[in-house]
């Protein structure tokens, strides 16, 4: 059985197991195993040949990456916002490299990167996903670009980034793990915890940590504990822009806004509401 089959098996067991106090420990161990398997997939994809990756020199006060499926309008938006020359076409994978542009706004110099479209399976290397994700990991803000007719892409994109160790709109859990030579695992916290001390010890043992003192200053869940143990997560703010609204009828637009009320709705091609995108980016970067 391969890694992907192992992942599917663990995911299915998690789905089938009702969550309650009696099963929380078992589910926590399953999530720990799932995180290890996903990390193996990402590492395996990273170790494969076939591509030099992308080398992007960061510039300006902050770097923003436009993330979306192929042909959702990322290149058009970059061109309209910055005047950069990213090839535009109504077919998939028009952008085969990272195209940088610069937005000067409210006395800030913001680098905006147009990367090749992400697709399902990107975290495991599909569609140059490995190279694209390496760029995303180093940016200061993710701007999701969705097609108004295919807004379900948002869930796929966030899951791919999650599987690649990118945590969006979250803060790093306040957990300190101090390894020791002996003494087993001791756990202390500054508040009552959602997770049990036994589960904390079990997760650390899963990652071959058998002697350590763990100090927890947040009421974390098991996913956040796993993130803290793995130590290779990045935490990036994210916002959402829905494009091609000029092509949508009232019903489609209404349904999309019900699903994504916080998104900014635009037509990059018709240059509709682009000032709102500039404000969105500037505010999210919290200058």
Task: Please give the residue ranges for each predicted region.
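Conserved G1/Walker A P-loop phosphate-binding module
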Residues: 2-197, 201-207
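Canonical P-loop GTPase G-domain recognition
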Residues: 5, 22-25, 168-207, 214-220, ...
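Short amphipathic alpha-helical segments and helix-helix/interface helices
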Residues: 133, 226-229, 253-254
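Flexible, charged surface loops at secondary-structure boundaries
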Residues: 136-138, 232-235
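Phosphate-interacting basic helix/loop segments used at nucleotide- and nucleic-acid interfaces
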Residues: 219-232
